[in-house]
């Protein structure tokens, strides 16, 4: 199933429609610290981030946007809570997109002022609903955060922005409860055609957060829901990008990146397959080319079981084989497996250039 969402422009990016899914992250620096924030944004860009959000929690942070913009090339999103005037200041200083939280931005009149300023500069707004900060009235109606509460909050503010003749809208409905988050996105995707920003909020540390994000975001992407995403981890933001890229890669939603498949090992394994798989992953981790490598621990069954891989190695004690698309190419010594694999792939890629 595919959703045909409308397209919203954020600086030079197009989000929605048939455009590729955009990967986002968020800085964890003091936004007023220009040097530290610029350094982190540029590090995020190096690993594949395409859009960066930064908290604008005071006047100094809002004023820093102008200087930060001079030193980075990625579009920037201002994360606004409580004080609508900070949104106005962020717009004045050249922000590319706003994220407002309906639960704490204030009165409709405040929202109108933000919308008018954003419209004048062609700046899109993400309505970022969060299960932890749903409006008091809606929370009282439902008794606790739930799917319907998230959707009602989002729909109210979508209609409010539309009333002010504003349609450059992106929507998110985040929760730390994966099931609630998935159901909320599915429901709103049937109600509006605005691009959806996917994410599990407060997902947790690297391991748990990766699992929760892969399940929540992945389930929606399989349904054809989602136009941009952020994996939230209690970790260096660079790790968020690595996980996000992997999610897109395994769902065949990315045009680049090497996918490594490897067997889980069993009693037939006679080499350090875990170490070998990690070596292969590290060697090809940064490659832009799109292909699949199999690392198998059994020379008898390995090539056949990994037939869908473009390239592969299978190893026994002291000896291994190289294979392509399940067909054995040659036998090599165990110690030369990685080097021979690199050589085979490198030669293939060079031939494709010609």
Swiss-Prot record:
Gene Ontology biological process terms in this record: isopentenyl diphosphate biosynthetic process, methylerythritol 4-phosphate pathway; terpenoid biosynthetic process
| InterPro entries from the UniProt entry | Dihydropteroate_synth-like_sf, IspG_bac, IspG_bac-typ, NO2/SO3_Rdtase_4Fe4S_sf
Q: Which cofactor does it need?
A: [4Fe-4S] cluster
Positions of [4Fe-4S] cluster binding: 263, 266, 298, 305
Source taxon at top rank: Bacteria
Q: Does the keyword 4Fe-4S apply?
A: yes
Q: According to the UniProt record, what class of enzyme is this?
A: oxidoreductase
Q: What is its EC number?
A: 1.17.7.3
Reactions it catalyzes: (2E)-4-hydroxy-3-methylbut-2-enyl diphosphate + oxidized [flavodoxin] + H2O + 2 H(+) = 2-C-methyl-D-erythritol 2,4-cyclic diphosphate + reduced [flavodoxin]
Q: Does the keyword Transmembrane apply?
A: no
Per the entry, the cofactor note is: Binds 1 [4Fe-4S] cluster.
MF term (GO), any: 4 iron, 4 sulfur cluster binding
- Identify the keywords attached in UniProt to this record, alphabetized: 4Fe-4S, Iron, Iron-sulfur, Isoprene biosynthesis, Metal-binding, Oxidoreductase
Q: In which pathway does it act?
A: Isoprenoid biosynthesis; isopentenyl diphosphate biosynthesis via DXP pathway; isopentenyl diphosphate from 1-deoxy-D-xylulose 5-phosphate: step 5/6
Would you identify the family this protein belongs to, as annotated? Belongs to the IspG family.
Q: What job does the chain carry out?
A: Converts 2C-methyl-D-erythritol 2,4-cyclodiphosphate (ME-2,4cPP) into 1-hydroxy-2-methyl-2-(E)-butenyl 4-diphosphate.
Q: Which PANTHER family match?
A: 4-HYDROXY-3-METHYLBUT-2-EN-1-YL DIPHOSPHATE SYNTHASE, 4-HYDROXY-3-METHYLBUT-2-EN-1-YL DIPHOSPHATE SYNTHASE (FERREDOXIN), CHLOROPLASTIC
What this protein is called in its record is 4-hydroxy-3-methylbut-2-en-1-yl diphosphate synthase (flavodoxin)
Q: Which organism is it from?
A: Fusobacterium nucleatum subsp. nucleatum (strain ATCC 25586 / DSM 15643 / BCRC 10681 / CIP 101130 / JCM 8532 / KCTC 2640 / LMG 13131 / VPI 4355)
Gene designation per UniProt = ispG
């Amino acid at each position: 199933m595919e959703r045909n969402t409308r397209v919203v422009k954020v600086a030079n990016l197009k989000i929605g429609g048939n455009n590729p899914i955009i990967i986002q992250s968020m800085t964890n620096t003091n936004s007023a610290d220009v040097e530290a924030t610029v350094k982190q944004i540029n590090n995020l860009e190096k690993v594949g981030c395409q859009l960066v959000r930064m908290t604008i929690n005071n006047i100094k942070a809002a004023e820093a946007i102008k200087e930060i913009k001079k030193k980075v090339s990625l579009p920037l999103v201002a994360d606004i809570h409580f004080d609508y005037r900070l949104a106005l200041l962020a717009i004045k200083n050249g922000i590319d997109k706003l994220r407002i939280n309906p639960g704490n931005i204030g009165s409709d009149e405040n929202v109108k002022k933000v919308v008018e300023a954003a419209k004048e500069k062609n700046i899109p707004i993400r309505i970022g609903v969060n299960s932890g900060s749903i409006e008091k009235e809606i929370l009282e109606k439902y008794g606790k955060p739930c799917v319907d509460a998230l959707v009602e909050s989002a729909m109210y503010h979508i209609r409010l922005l539309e009333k002010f003749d504003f349609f450059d809208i992106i929507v998110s409905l985040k929760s730390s409860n994966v099931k609630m988050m998935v159901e909320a996105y599915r429901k709103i995707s049937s109600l509006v055609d605005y691009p959806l920003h996917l994410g599990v909020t407060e997902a947790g540390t690297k391991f748990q957060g990766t699992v929760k994000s892969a399940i929540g975001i992945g389930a929606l992407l399989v349904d054809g829901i989602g136009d941009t995403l952020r994996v939230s981890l209690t970790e260096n933001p660079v790790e968020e990008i690595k996980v996000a890229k992997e999610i897109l890669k395994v769902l065949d939603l990315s045009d680049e990146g090497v996918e490594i498949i490897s067997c889980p090992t069993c009693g037939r394994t006679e080499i350090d397959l875990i170490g070998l798989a990690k070596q292969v992953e590290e060697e090809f981790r940064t490659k832009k080319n799109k292909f699949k490598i199999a690392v198998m621990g059994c020379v008898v069954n390995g090539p056949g079981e990994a037939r869908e891989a473009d390239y592969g190695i299978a190893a026994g004690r002291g000896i291994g084989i190289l294979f392509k698309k399940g067909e054995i190419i040659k036998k090599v010594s165990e110690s030369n497996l990685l080097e021979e694999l690199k050589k085979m792939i490198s030669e293939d890629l060079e031939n494709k250039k010609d």
